[in-house]
Amino acid sequence: RLILTVLFLATGSTAAYAADNFPYGSSLSFAAVRNGQTIGHHRLTFQKSGTQLKVSTEIDLAVKFMGVTAYRYMHRAEEFWNGDTFQSLAAQTDDDGKKTAIRIRRDGAALAVERNARPDVLSPAKFDRGLQRDDSIRTTLPPQLLPSSHWNVRQVRQAALINTQTGAEARVQVSVLGRETIRTANDSIDATRYRYTGDLVMDQWFDDAGRWVKTSF
C-alpha cells in the first residue's frame, strides 16, 4: 500500500496566488510511504499569471530490497489551464523501465491525444525528446474531462478523468467516506475522505479550502 501525505501546506502569499481564491501557494510536496518506509516524493509547482496556470508534477519512487533497488518509478508532467478550463498536458513516465509519453491539447470540441505506440520499447533518446510523428498514435477524448493529477478538488465530482500516464479515459465512481484529521510535518488538518472505484482505485483527502492533503493507493 502506497500513501502520499502532504509535508507542508500553505496558501499563496502573493497577489497572483491569492487571486480567484486559488487554494495553493507556489508548491506542494508529499512524502511517499510504503509499509512504513519513505520511498520517494511527489512534488507539484504552480505558476500563475492572471487566468493562466501552469502545474508541474515531479514523482520519484524507489523500492529497495536488501539495499538493492527492486522497483523504480519516475513521472514528469506539465499541464496548462485558462481559468477553470483545462488546456493541455504533456507527460513522460518511466514505470520500472516501461517508458511512456503523452501529449493532450484542447482542439475545438474535443481533446486531442497523442501517445507513443510501443511503450515497452521506447528508446531513451525518444523518451528524452518526447513524442515523434513516426511512433505515436492519436485519439480524442471528450472536452470536459479533467486530468487525474490529484490536486484539483473538482475531480471528486467527475464520472471520468484523464489517466495522466496513459492518456486514456478512466471511468470512476467517487463516494464520500467522511471527515478525518490528517497530520502533516507541522500541523493537523481536518479533511474529507473520498473513495474512487472503477478504472482508478484510491482514497483521497481534501481539506475545507479544497487543497489536496493525502492519497492512499
PLM region spans:
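Bacterial N-terminal signal peptides
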Residues: 3-13
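Boundary at the C-terminal end of the N-terminal hydrophobic targeting segment
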Residues: 15-20
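Solvent-exposed helix/loop surface patches that form functional interfaces
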Residues: 22-25, 90-191, 216
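N-terminal mature ectodomain segment of secretory-pathway/periplasmic proteins
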Residues: 22-113, 210, 215-217
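Short, acidic, Ser/Thr-enriched surface-loop or helix-capping motifs
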Residues: 33, 183, 207
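Tryptophan-centered motif/residue detector
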Residues: 81, 132-133, 151, 205, ...
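Short, exposed beta-strand-loop hairpins at the edges of beta-sheets
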Residues: 196, 202-207, 211-217
